């Protein structure tokens, strides 16, 4: 047990002694010069590539997409929302954070000769917790709409040969995405590798305030020091910091039960697991901010962004090393479908003998009433 954990000088920050924890510890301890080198490897910062030809499957000639898929059949799907993040920030803050992180990973893998595929976010308007209701600038989609959108995009990507899907979330709607992933698997039982990653939580240790020059000084909550810092690093022209204000939420019951956005305190409940214990956003923080964005600097976002890029690269590389393009885990181990029956569906799309998911026999329980 003594070698199970990699500790730091901060008792609340430690890492599991495995590939993931060792990677995080290395970045946590790295000098700023090494962090800068990591960011340079991924060409951070760079302008948004949403309109840049050859970045996303939607702005790349299909022939090129197919050729790249034969080398690397992993697809990244960034997920954000449209939400008030205070007068200083753009309402697409979440979307631009996550798309630029995904774009950086594509740039990096392209340099290595096997570019990961990147899909436009299907959820520019997302699901929200109840306490977001009533805020101007926040556009709330019904959870069923968000769930079905994700399920059908997963199906379409799978049908096009992108059967290893990493959905990267940048908004407070994780429970909906988790539910969609599980429903997709139950409904279709298609062999593949599917992940939803809440990227802030994936590298939560880097959002915990510590005594270091490049560290944040406050806990990550919403439209705060953490989010503004990431925005200042990745897309500073979309922010106007002279309009930033600091606020605090309002608790209506004793604290200590519900954690903040990245679960740094390991409290009994995550922030989304209740309502009524705190005032809704409209009543407590009509500014659309919970925290201190006035303290934000691009420098404070460099280590967290380096950490998520290295972690996502690890996830990507482990999948591709174990299951190269065109290969999946054994069908009989991850699906109740007969391997012989599913074989035509697993062929390269539009190749001889290939079958589309629209020819897929239905198995399993009824999925809707």
Predicted regions and their residues:
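Extended, histidine- and acidic-residue-enriched regions that form the cofactor-binding/catalytic faces
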Residues: 1-141, 148-164, 170-369
